[in-house]
């Protein structure tokens, strides 16, 4: 994930900063406790595609859908 992109991209729900999780290929909003998947190098910043952090930790297979 490009560091410059991380400087300008924001959570679509709270407009907060996102943190890159390279292990799971997702952008995390710690304020809302959600993650946005990155598919083929493209962050999917749609609120209906966001994954609850508790869900992603307990069911990692959901991230690949």
Swiss-Prot record:
GO cellular component terms attached to this protein's record: cytosol
InterPro entries named in the record: Trm112-like
Extent of the signal sequence: none
Gene3D superfamilies (alphabetical): 2.20.25.10
Source species, domain of life: Bacteria
A Pfam family this chain is assigned to: Trm112p
Family: Belongs to the UPF0434 family.
Name of protein: UPF0434 protein HS_0657
Organism: Histophilus somni (strain 129Pt) (Haemophilus somnus)
